[in-house]
Amino acid sequence: MQLRVHPTMDCSGRSTSNIERDSDLGDDLSHGDRTDDEMRDCDSVDGEHHQLSAKAAIAARLSHTVSGGGGSFASPEPQTELPLSHHHQLPPNHPLNALGSFMGIGGLHSIPNLQHSDVLEKLKMQVRDMKVGLMEQDYAAAAHAAAFGANMLPTTISSGFPLPHNSVAFGHVTSSPSGGNGSSYNGGTTPTNSSNSNATTNGGGTAGPGGTGGSGGGGGGGGGGGGGVGGHQFSFASPTAAPSGKEARHFAANSASNSSTSSEASNSSQQNNGWSFEEQFKQVRQLYEINDDPKRKEFLDDLFSFMQKRGTPINRLPIMAKSVLDLYELYNLVIARGGLVDVINKKLWQEIIKGLHLPSSITSAAFTLRTQYMKYLYPYECEKKNLSTPAELQAAIDGNRREGRRSSYGQYEAMHNQMPMTPISRPSLPGGMQQMSPLALVTHAAVANNQQAQAAAAAAAAHHRLMGAPAFGQMPNLVKQEIESRMMEYLQLIQAKKEQGMPPVLGGNHPHQQQHSQQQQQQQHHHQQQQQQQSQQQHHLQQQRQRSQSPDLSKHEALSAQVALWHMYHNNNSPPGSAHTSPQQREALNLSDSPPNLTNIKREREREPTPEPVDQDDKFVDQPPPAKRVGSGLLPPGFPANFYLNPHNMAAVAAAAGFHHPSMGHQQDAASEGEPEDDYAHGEHNTTGNSSSMHDDSEPQQMNGHHHHQTHHLDKSDDSAIENSPTTSTTTGGSVGHRHSSPVSTKKKGGAKPQSGGKDVPTEDKDASSSGKLNPLETLSLLSGMQFQVARNGTGDNGEPQLIVNLELNGVKYSGVLVANVPLSQSETRTSSPCHAEAPTVEEEKDEEEEEEPKAAEEESHRSPVKQENEDVDQDMEGSEVLLNGGASAVGGAGAGVGVGVPLLKDAVVS
């Protein structure tokens, strides 16, 4: 047998003693981790002859052992052709034949004659992929038996020479080999000695015969070995001659890093099947031959060797526009402009694209060039030029991304600037909204200090969420939707807080954060105000969730943010995406089904509340608390809180924004009494299970353990809303807006209708029609143009708290009295206060939700007449009033709806 080892087998196996088996043939089988690092250090393939001699000695021993000592060890010298002393027709049980039949590769018997590195590499790769190679002896035996047939397994799997336990001694040991614990592999006739990673690791005799550069361009050739298979000597020397030239050196250096194939091509072939050495060599040659500039070759040699040394060899060259990316020109163009960081910051990619003569049709050329430069050239730039640091690069990339995001806000900002700001909204909404940036979300903690920043952050959050969802309609619609979503989030937060007896906190980048802090505070309030243990427990659950979600925000900031958002919401004259809003209302009942789509949920809920009288009653109860909040306009400070807390408004906003589903999710848990309400279920809770009545609410809360937050809204949140709401007028505006938001409340109206029962059914129908008319979009549009003013906050003739409110919507002025829902006696007395919303207000006053459950039923009955009365009003101002009341029309059309949505305008007068 002739076994020739090329002397230039340097890095492929530096250490003959430190060899680890690798379960995957694709890896460097013949060297351990240490040798891998060492091999990476070698730049060229021509060195370490002393190691070679050691390898040669081991290989000689191996070949003697395998072939019975008949092997002749040829002096190491480069050779292009390796004589193969074996029959071209291999015995049927020969590993190559077996491999051919196993892998479906024909003509493997003639492989020894082929001096084609491509075939050799591919074959190696495939065998490697089959994981035929260095393995534990038992595993190797089993795998070999499975792959090549048990008849081919050597009687003993052992190497004929003592090798380190991890060393590989491949060889056909069919001729009884002397003992040894090396895992000699049946499939490989080439004994791969520990240092000699080449060839046989590739799975039985596949590695051997190769032409020059066969197993590796780097020529980390593998020692050949002869195994007597069926009496036929199959000696094949792994190709050791490396392709001449710098390319060969680079490849050899790369190949050294994985000694199993000793070639970069084999490296890449391991990663990408079909990526042959020849193709890779062609690529590199193209790169060198783009022009004859000597500096190009110098640079490329330096670059390849540098990347090899740092352990990240360039295995595949990037391709752009169907040709190899000219790394030399790219590097020069970037360096001439101050380095990668400057190019990114100054946006000079178009110049570089032109300099590289890339077609302008490439859409993401700048991004691709940046990523390829970062991968292949930036480490080299840092080493040679030191123009920037990786930290500066990351900062530049992040800054670029932020700018890209800002551009998407440009339209929104323009819309915001164009939006007429209502007097209320202007003070509450500082110009900071325009300064909103994506960073607001990230740095919400820092931004929390300023209300404007908070509002901006909320807007950014809404925008990003909306961006995640399919875009609906035009940008103006999107903006509206964003505002709606923000409002929904804020409302939810307020509701949660009020439930917990906390003042609503709308400020803060994330309503959820506010909710958490609010909920935490609310938990305290709950403990203090424990009206209903169940509701408190529910609050606690919500609070915990909220706590986990966000940091606490100052109440004042939160309130300011609420007002600002509300104003923004109002100011959006462009109707929110009608598609968005209306679907939300329609899907009100589906909240449980599609928590992410508030719009869908809202719509479903609106539809469903009617079928679910009890749930609707509960919803009414929940909704009334918001109404109370609205009604708590009676208590000007609490009015905004009430308004925000209004479940209808929240639901509408949430549906529109698809936003509050996180915060809603907590509340929904509470309200998941009969329906899996979506996260947006704050408002939805009211619609689904909590709106039956505030009183019912306490029961549902007990039942659901989730309505608690709504019930609390009715009791505590209403009270807290009254107590905490600092800006009555603003709040009123907000509450009115919320009523408009009442598209959600319209759903609630539907719910209320079922509550009211048969006599309300017609009203319900009307409300249904009105609610149908009032899309969240319509509601929002109405809200955006509505002026809300509390003319008087006092008590009525019967001593009940009431608000005299003036509304101007679409040029029509409405004035009316909002009556707080008082305990049963009061609510009964107050037939005109059919609004459940008012009931929540009364409940706030009472903090007697438990008592109110029965009251709620009575109130509902009262409401029905009132609703009927309101129906007339609604008929008069169905479009506008419904929006105003969040169910004013609902109040008339759906008394329950009114109760749910807002306190009824007792005397709705169209001026």
From Swiss-Prot:
Ranges of compositional bias, category Low complexity: 174-201, 252-273, 512-550
GO biological process: anterior/posterior pattern specification; axon guidance; dendrite morphogenesis; embryonic pattern specification; gliogenesis; male courtship behavior; muscle organ development; negative regulation of transcription by RNA polymerase II
Residues the record lists as Phosphothreonine modifications: T35
Source superkingdom: Eukaryota
Keyword Transferase appears in the UniProt entry: no
Major localization listed first in the record, in broad terms: nucleus
Compositionally biased residues, Gly residues: 202-231
Domain ARID: 293-385
Biased composition (Polar residues): 570-600
Subcellular location as annotated: Nucleus
GO-annotated cellular components: nucleus
Keyword check for Phosphoprotein: yes
Function text: Transcription factor which is a downstream target of gcm and repo. Directly or indirectly activates the transcription of locos and pros, which are essential for the development of some glial cells. Plays an essential role in defining the cell shape and migration characteristics of longitudinal glia that enable them to establish a normal axon scaffold.
Entry protein name: Protein dead ringer
Gene symbol of the encoding locus: retn
